């Protein structure tokens, strides 16, 4: 009898423990669900090369702990790959221009640098790039300074030369040092194509301040073959941050050299605006790469882009830059309202001028985004 009572007590104790564990699990699930409700999801979208991944890295630097030494070191092979890819593009581009351009002679690499060029082009063709040694860096620097390569670089928009080219070419000796550890700035310039989805959680005014919202930002692969993978993220998103590289009005796609990048951006923005799951979603449009745009607009007419063919310059210098920017901004605003159902025109839509590499500007922009979304939440709660 005593044995039976003891056994029953053990069973009862086990049941009580299981019940307590189950209750604790349910409590934690409930708490996590409540916590999730206070986290606003932001979807960072844009065509390839729009600068959105640089903005994503800026958020990590600005509103999180940044990159630790291990993370910085993980970018070393990426940066070295960017260097080899860039010099190959410039070398091969100069050969192509030397064969096909009317003014072909200025694209002919000097005899003393031809062997170096062929060697570096071969390295750039490999899947596994070597470590950037001091010797290789000197050879790359020699080729970079060749007049033909500089002429080719001036036409980089036609050759898919990445925006990081000049920065890395001017820092070759530092990048090839045996003890080199990438800096935060190096990481911002590093170009690695986003595939799939990466996310980060942050608050523009700090996690410990009650007035600030907590956001979960998703960066999604921008190239065409990645877009259909976005669909599972669409539902419940508070806002879409759409990046448009306004400097790329005269460039073609990495994936399709017959397609203008600005035309692709226009079509993508229009497609996203019309998605049913975004009917109540706020839209934050980042007109990005303004730093490049303001230099290019003085050399390359805006109306070379089919979408901007009706643009007429009215001035020169700074006035022309502002006039061109306002024209582009108006085009996107018109597209937004044309692609938005009449009953949805009251959803939040803001346009920001951005330069992804400008940390102060990105910090200011995200605080403005935070303010807009908090005001919307207060309005929907009937508090405004």
From Swiss-Prot:
Transmembrane segments: none
Lipidation (N-myristoyl glycine): 2
Region (G2 motif): 186-194
UniProt keyword terms in alphabetical order: GTP-binding, Hydrolase, Lipoprotein, Magnesium, Metal-binding, Myristate, Nucleotide-binding, Palmitate, Transducer
One cellular component (GO) term of this entry: cytoplasm
Region G4 motif: start-end pairs: 284-291
Cystine crosslinks: none
Name under which the protein is recorded: Guanine nucleotide-binding protein alpha-1 subunit
Lineage, highest ranks first: Eukaryota, Viridiplantae, Streptophyta, Embryophyta, Tracheophyta
Gene: GPA1
């Amino acid at each position: 009898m005593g044995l039976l009572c003891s056994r029953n007590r053990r069973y009862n104790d086990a049941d009580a423990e299981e019940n307590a564990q189950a209750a604790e699990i349910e409590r934690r699930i409930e708490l996590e669900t409540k916590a999730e409700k206070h986290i606003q999801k932001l979807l960072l979208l844009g065509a390839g090369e729009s600068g959105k991944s640089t903005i994503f890295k800026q958020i990590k630097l600005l509103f999180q702990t940044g990159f630790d030494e291990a993370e910085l070191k993980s970018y070393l092979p990426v940066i070295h790959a960017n260097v080899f890819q860039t010099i190959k593009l410039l070398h091969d581009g100069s050969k192509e221009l030397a064969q096909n351009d009317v003014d072909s002679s200025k694209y002919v690499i000097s005899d003393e640098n031809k062997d170096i060029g062929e060697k570096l082009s071969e390295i750039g063709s490999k899947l596994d790039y070597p470590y950037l040694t001091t010797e290789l860096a000197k050879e790359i620097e020699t080729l970079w300074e060749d007049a033909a390569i500089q002429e080719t670089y001036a036409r980089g928009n036609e050759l898919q030369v990445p925006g990081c080219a000049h920065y890395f070419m001017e820092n070759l000796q530092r990048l090839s040092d045996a003890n080199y550890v990438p800096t935060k700035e190096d990481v911002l310039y590093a170009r690695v194509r986003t595939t799939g989805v990466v996310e980060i959680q942050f608050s523009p005014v700090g996690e410990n301040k009650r007035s600030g919202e907590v956001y979960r930002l998703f960066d999604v692969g921008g190239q065409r073959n990645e877009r259909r993978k976005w669909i599972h993220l669409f539902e419940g998103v508070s806002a879409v941050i759409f990046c448009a590289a306004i400097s790329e009005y005269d460039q073609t796609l990495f994936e399709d050299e017959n397609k203008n990048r600005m035309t692709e951006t226009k079509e993508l923005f229009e497609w996203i605006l019309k998605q049913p799951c975004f009917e109540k979603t706020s839209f934050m449009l980042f007109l990005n790469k303004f730093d490049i745009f303001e230099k290019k607009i003085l050399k390359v007419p805006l109306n070379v882009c089919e979408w901007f063919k009706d643009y007429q310059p009215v001035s020169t210098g700074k006035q022309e830059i502002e006039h061109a920017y306002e024209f582009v901004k108006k085009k996107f605003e018109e597209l937004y309202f044309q692609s938005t159902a009449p009953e949805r025109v009251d959803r939040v839509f803001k346009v920001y001028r951005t330069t992804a590499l400008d940390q102060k500007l990105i910090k200011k922009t995200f605080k403005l985004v935070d303010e807009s979304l908090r005001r919307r939440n207060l309005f929907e709660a009937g508090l405004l």
